[in-house]
Amino acid sequence: MDFFDLDIEIKQERLPAECSLNSPLNYSLSAQLTDRMTPRTENVRRQRERLRSHMREHFRVKDLSTLDNDSTRLHARLTEDLITIQSPEIDSSVLENWTPLKSYYASLDYTLPEKTAFKWEHAAPYWNLFAQLRAILLQSQKIKKQETGTRELYSCGPLQIEFVEGVVLYFTDRGSKEEFTKSGELPSVTPYADFLAWIKIISQRAQAVLMAVILRVTDKGLSPLPESLLAIYQNVDDILKRAGQPAIDLLKLWEPLVITKLGELLGDRFGLEEDFRNTIRGEATKLAKNLFISRGLNRLMDILDQQTDAQPLFQFFGLFKHFAYPRVFSRDTIQAIQEVSDRPSSISAVDFLHDQCEIRKEFYVRYINAYHRAPGLDLSALSPSSFLRDSLERGKIPNERSPLYSNKEWYFVKFTKSIEWPVSDTLSTFLSDKAITRDRPAWIEDGHSGRDMSEKRLLLKFIKENFSSVADIVGAAEAIYNNQEDRLIALKVKEMELKIKGRGFGLMTFMPRLLQVLRESIAKKTQKLFPEITMTSSDLDMKKRKFMLSKKSDDRRGFIHVNKSLDINKFCTSQRQFNSNAVFSSLDELMGTFPLFSRVHEIFEKTWIVDGSSSDPPNLAHFTRILDECTALGLDTPHIWADGVFSGLKGGIEGLCQYVWTICLLLRVERVMQKTALTHYILAQGDNVIITIIVPVEIHRDGTIPEQESRRILALSRDIDLSLESELEKSGLTLKIEETLTSENISIYGKDLHCPQHLTLAIKKAASAAIISSEQYQDVPTFLSGLGTSLEALSECVNNKVGVHLFGVIMGVAGWRDLATHQTWRGWRYPYHKKAITGRIRASEMKLSKGEPTELSISVLSKRRRETETLIELLSNSLLGSALGMLAFPTPLDLEKRGVGDYITHRLTIARKALLSGHLDPRIGRKVESACNIPLSSRTDLSKLFDSPFSLNIATEEDATAVIKRQATKILRLQEIKNEKLKAQIDNMDKGIATLDAALAGATNINPRLNYMIRSITDEKESEMFVTKFASARTMRTLAMNHSSELPIVILLEMKSQQKETYTIWRTKRPPVTMWKCSTVLAKELRDTSWGKNIIGGTSPSPIEAMETIQIDPTEWEDRRSQDAMSINYYLSRAGMDEQTAKLTRGFLVPYYGTQTKPLVAKAYLELKGNPRTNKALLLLSVRESLVKTGSNLDKLIIKLCSHALDIDVASLPALRAQEEAAAGEGLRGGIKESMSPVGPDNFYTNITHKVFNRKWATPYHVNIADFIIQGLIETRRHLLVNERMNGLLPVSSVKCTSCFRKKEREFFDIPEEFTWKNESKTSDPAYTYFTTWCDLPRVSNLPEMDQRSATRLLGRGLALNRSSSGEIITKFYSMPMESQRLLHPVELLLGYGEGVIFGYLRSQHINHGALFHIGDESLAKKLRRYVLDTKTQHAKQIGYLFQDEDSLHELLGQGLCPYIPRSIPLTITELTNACAITTIRATEVILSTKARIHHMPVQAIDESDVDTSRLAANTMQTILGDPRPMNLVHLDCDLTHNMVAWESEVELDILKSENFHIDGLLVELTARELPIGDTPWKQRDWTCSNDPKIIAKGIKTKSLFIHQGVTGAINLIPDLLVVIGGGLGGCAVPYLQEWPDTPIIFATLFDERERISEDGDLIVPPELLVRGMAPRMIEREILEAELCDITNEGNRRLLIRLVTKNKGGGKVVLIDEIENRGAPESLLQSSLQDLFEKLDKVCKLTSVHTVRESTVEQFSQRVNSIKRSRKAVTLHWNRYNRRDQFEALVIVKGEEAKSDYRISTITSAKAFRKIDEQLEIDGRLSSTQWSLPALPSREKNILFGYVSSVFLKMNLALSANDMDRERLIETIEGTAPGLISWKEKLEHRDHAHRSDIEEKGITQDKIFNLICLSWVLKGLRYGVWDTDAQSIVAQTVYITRGPKLCPLGEKPKRIFASFKLQSGKRVEDAKGFLSALLHLEGFFPLGEQ
């Protein structure tokens, strides 16, 4: 870890983008800045100009090219000079932190001596220099410039440093004698990044020396001398100073040189051959000679040669990692060299023995059971009585369950015949590989061939170990491979070859293997859609990703990263095809898992290898002895148990081959890459080679890449591909050029791969649920958790700081502990950014005043708290290995005896010990734990954790095998899967396989013609693999699910080949791989320029155009082609749906337009049209479809008729077999669905009816003639529905707008391609792409060119489609905040929004149904209205803010877009939602009616003053208590109907006097006769509106106008004062004011700005009635404000009583109580009311009218008793506006009534209601017309319409006043009512429907109830009969007839498509309420239209 976490401390924002920390250290940039090269980019040019002017001003330098800019030499020189002048005393900060240092060592059981014991003088110079430079760096980034004139200079000793424009100037202080920069007065110049790298190099050296110093005291043998480190550094500086940049190539060889020395020390064990050593040293010498620095090199080599200890020498690794280290030996390679040993997979000897036996058993079973070539068994080792021997001699497999069977005995069975298989054979096949075959003699005679000598040496290294000459090898190989007998068995291996780690299946059991295969096939399919997600997160892939991503950077504009992933043809062929095949394929056949084992190195990870050719296996005694010896010594079990048994073979034989090849390959690739002179990185493992190249490019200001640059990069990329190809050819490796992917060619959703955000998160989430990565089988928890995370977060965010941190964490988890300290040529790189720390540093900023250039000299080390933290970082990291590979503690390790790999293991052991010791500073402990990802739950997991250096995350106790054994079955059976997505996924998988099974079940023979066709269109490579995998998966799954352990292998193999064969039928051709012709950038530019014209690139239609269709006569096709006006919709089912969805969403199907199908198409249609037999058959078949669905047995009859009509032999049709199977098996429907064979030209007629919808299409284009017929059928059926008979032509529906044509249609009609943006991406459907692009917002930068109105329109469209929050969007488009801007052009905004909504609706249809169905404007309008209502909350979120602003509202109202002006702003949520919905509906209607362009629609506007007059003025207490301001009442109109404009002011006052309003009620007297009981507690009513006291009561309902009608007659007195409590705006007072126009009135109503409008669209009384009717009679404007009418407050009650007393004390007062409980406890409210009434009773003659509504009679009585003020009798007043579903009535308590203490009993109340019901029924029987209201004047019609429409709205039907015309209303209800039922989606797009299209399950009782009500209305409207007996209405059946249409109640049609009946009679009361409200319709449509 870097001692100072620079990236944390340094903010990069102040640096120009071109010179950020991550700029490449190249000459090019500084050369461009300093005039030695022409600047390549505009940015660099501008930067250079600024630099020039600075130099002219301060240094009088005209020509920058005179300056010294060789940073390599300069920094080497500076380091030398500055180190010499440093003080030898180390700065105190290190020593101050001695304590954590000591406790750290204590935790390792090690005591540090006192600090005085150390000699610091070696460490001091670098340490102090670093401290100074770091201080300069931090200061330079803190200072804030205030003036352009100010300069900041920093000094480090005599050196002056200045930062200008991303470059650093170095010059010597004039007073100083030394000239550090060697260029006199002139400064030297380097890029900022070079300066940073220099500092990081110094920092690294400081640490190294400090470590060395500490180690010299604590453990001499561990570390090199500090002197030798310093000497190396000094020599290197000297070399660099002399040779400059080229010398870095020499430093690249530093590690190989160290390796050569190590090899000498460790001897041959280390595996380095002499010639290899000489090569490396030779290379170095040659290079040094060329650079004239041989002496420097020799001095370095001397220092190396002085090191005679392996341990200190090992610490020299990594000293120069920060130079561009060429990966010739990548870090991984070195680790592989070190991995010379590892622990065995199982430590327990018994487990070992068991595994061992299992393996032998696998081999032997294979021999005995399957083939005659089984070797002889030597059973002499077994005792004659052995059960095993007995069974083997009889040639049987022993029965494991037998009590006699002993697992151990297997171990001692021996082969007698076997094949030798040493590694050299592998090489011999290498040597016979095609590269060498060209020139074999040359090899044998030790001549030369096309291969590099270096590669040859590497090969020879292996050969020498086994053979004396190459000729021997070839001879041996031929002998082996020509001998048929012995080709099969055992392995002969040497210990040395078993040490390289590989990865693979280990001892996976069947279940996980099975899961694996299935997963891979799923992933294979998904990969095409989501390439990044499906990459598996194996070790290798993590490496790949880490590699590719770590080379990227977010703040480097001007560079493009091109990643190439090489795909080499038949790499390792030799391993796969020759040697490994013998063993692996036998294993594969044994297990029926064909491709699994046969891949390279996949079996060896966990196995123990048995060498059959060895001497006898150890006897039991020998075995036990070894075991005991090890146990006694406390050793782990050894790798080699006996002669011929090995564990720990990690990747084994193949691993070695691969290792050799990897190196060969690397040398080749590196050679090609060096020629390009571009910065590049290579990662290689085996044939996986990834190259990252960084290419500088010129970019536009907005970040786009110009066309010519793109072309240049592509050309460059291709050149590299070609040169790689020819270079690799020399090694006999052929590159598959077309599959060598470059990020330039890969685009996902049209974005280039090197854009960071490829996919939206949502898609990722969905995808990760669908993919189970193939590496997640390790254990079940991983497997499940992998689903949630995948790596989506990683790919989403590695381009930002947070992402990098996350990435770091993931890498840590994957065991890449050195990531945090990864050094590259740039120095250090960190994945972490901690904002808090950055903030802390930035907080202490200095400010400079004007004036002189200021010089800041910084003291040698400022004391900062930071030191402790850094030290802790350093210590914690050294626990896991510091950057140097140094250890700060002793290693009692004998390197000669064990491999270097143990060294690492040993370190981890020590780390573990330290962690468990408890001495460790907790902060260090935490750091280490987080680096290792130790689970917090348990510290004891440490032992597992540190087992293997490669995977620090094995934090689970059980090993994979155990977990899988335990849980695989469960997973397969879907138990214990909590993850819903996963469950669904596995279900889906099962379903898919089941479907395939069923479809393939009967295919015993394959039609040869079909077979031929298939073969010609199969893509060999892919399908071979896929078919095989699939077949294996099927077979395995059968096994797993049946638990059939006894299944013989022969049957298995047979099953598999059968699966393979049948599956072949289904293979089809993939569409060819295409790329986007036109880059996304271009597409977006085209789109942006075309905004407002509704086109993209000149061709995209607007949604309105795209919806228009025309009908065409199919016979005229040929003629119409030339007119460019005809097309066919060819939306197909998408692949991968389940049958249900496919059946529902199949669109129109049209054939594949290829040359062969054209004639077929015409033929099919002509046949359909002209041939009466065909017509008849088609008609029959379509009938048959519905019959089959309903399971009718008429089916056979119909088939007969069909065969007669079509003249074909029914027996030849596959459908017949389906019939038989169905009858025998699963019932008709299931059978037919399950076993129909694929659609093909021979049998399409049969399949027409019911199969195609179930077809699983293998690709989106698997279409043939059958689909055509389907299209015909659909049209035919539609035709039949309309015309009832077949005649004339079948019309084809087609798009009018030619720009809507798709590619295939254009080909078919020979329409030339015009310039347009083509989407040829395989991954997305063209229509969808069109939608998304059309709706995408253009870049903001393009907006200023538009006029503001179109910009606003555009914004509206975006609002509707983009779903972000409104505030965001507004600020996105207008730079000013919303408040200052107000809202521009709200009308345009809304119309744009409307357009967007229409489009959004179409798009949603497209997404849901896989097709965009073209629908007429009329039906579209209805569907949109429905759609808007369904999504109304969303609209409120999007455009709600318009309604918070009065000006916008007036503008909208003036244009007729907004229905009303609410009386208060801000609105409540409910008001807002409703308003937005209506406004949106209105906007869409406008757009549809004007075909998308909007014309302002003047609607009669209202006068400003009227609106003002009617604004609500909220009155405060002061107003009530005597402020004489005039008072305005509210203007309110809050209905949900969209075309009610604001109320006109001319309202005749006498309207309310009109007869129409006079409604008589029923009066019933209730007398108190029951003895009073003690107070019963109040039950809280469950129907109260809301328990939130903040919500104030509803506005006046229309209802209250009506239910109080006629009460005045019942009261029969003229009061002196009217008091209204509750009741919203007091509408309840209006009927009283009709009678008593002069009575003064007091309002104590809930009357307030925030007053809420009820959700169901209740109307509010026209305010003029209130204004004109009541204002003059207000008593001193006595209106109590809302909070005062809360009469649960005693003060409010007192105030009310005071007002009454003051005005009419002692007079007659009528009180109207309309209070609804809004959340106060019931008892409190009732007692407060009682208290109020009783007190009022004392001050005046009080008559009170109460609205009482309760759900039970008991509660009704209780309520009446609480308000009757001890009167003996009260009067109930009921009229038909009261609800009948609850006990609701007005209770009149008269003042003059006699008093009595009795109570009114429940029985009395119940009788009263019964009397009311009887009275109603008598009235109803008298005459139905008596109930009708006379025709109303228009004004009241409007009022009532609000009431009626709100009831309809409750039934999901939105009506406008235009619909209030008898015929239209009938039509609307008939047509739309069936839509309330959940028909299947077919109904959405087609006018026909079948009985079977109604899902019975989806119909709730509510929906049926709604249907009944609507049906009742229909009857009333059509025949004038308005039934009032709710009981009988509810019991009736509703019918739906063809169309589908609703029938009037009681009418039964001839053709019933559906009928519904309520299941329960509970809805009677609801019906009373609904119907009494709907009865008002009678007033609109009286009999005979009077």
Swiss-Prot record:
Tree of life domain: Viruses
Cellular component, GO, one term: virion component
Location in or out of the cell: Virion; Host cytoplasm
EC number, as in UniProt: 2.7.7.48, 3.6.1.-, 2.7.7.88, 2.1.1.375
Swiss-Prot/TrEMBL keywords: ATP-binding, Host cytoplasm, Hydrolase, Methyltransferase, mRNA capping, mRNA processing, Multifunctional enzyme, Nucleotide-binding, Nucleotidyltransferase, RNA-directed RNA polymerase, S-adenosyl-L-methionine, Transferase, Viral RNA replication, Virion
Keyword Hydrolase attached: yes
Signal peptide: none
Residues reported to bind ATP: 1619-1628
Coiled-coil residue windows: none
Domain Mononegavirus-type SAM-dependent 2'-O-MTase: 1592-1788
Reactions catalysed: RNA(n) + a ribonucleoside 5'-triphosphate = RNA(n+1) + diphosphate; a 5'-end (5'-triphosphoguanosine)-adenylyl-adenylyl-cytidylyl-adenosine in mRNA + 2 S-adenosyl-L-methionine = a 5'-end (N(7)-methyl 5'-triphosphoguanosine)-(2'-O-methyladenylyl)-adenylyl-cytidylyl-adenosine in mRNA + 2 S-adenosyl-L-homocysteine + H(+); a 5'-end (5'-triphosphoguanosine)-adenylyl-adenylyl-cytidylyl-adenosine in mRNA + S-adenosyl-L-methionine = a 5'-end (5'-triphosphoguanosine)-(2'-O-methyladenylyl)-adenylyl-cytidylyl-adenosine in mRNA + S-adenosyl-L-homocysteine + H(+); a 5'-end triphospho-adenylyl-adenylyl-cytidylyl-adenosine in mRNA + GDP + H(+) = a 5'-end (5'-triphosphoguanosine)-adenylyl-adenylyl-cytidylyl-adenosine in mRNA + diphosphate
GO terms for MF: ATP binding; GTPase activity; mRNA 5'-cap (guanine-N7-)-methyltransferase activity; RNA-directed RNA polymerase activity
InterPro entries found in the cross-reference section: Mononeg_mRNAcap, Mononeg_RNA_pol_cat, Mononega_L_MeTrfase
Stretches assigned to the RdRp catalytic domain: 560-757
Subunit structure: May form homodimer. Interacts with the P protein.
Task performed by this protein: RNA-directed RNA polymerase that catalyzes the transcription of viral mRNAs, their capping and polyadenylation. The template is composed of the viral RNA tightly encapsidated by the nucleoprotein (N). The viral polymerase binds to the genomic RNA at the 3' leader promoter, and transcribes subsequently all viral mRNAs with a decreasing efficiency. The first gene is the most transcribed, and the last the least transcribed. The viral phosphoprotein acts as a processivity factor. Capping is concomitant with initiation of mRNA transcription.
Family: Belongs to the rhabdoviridae protein L family.
UniProt-recorded name of the protein: RNA-directed RNA polymerase L
Provenance organism: Infectious hematopoietic necrosis virus (strain Oregon69) (IHNV)
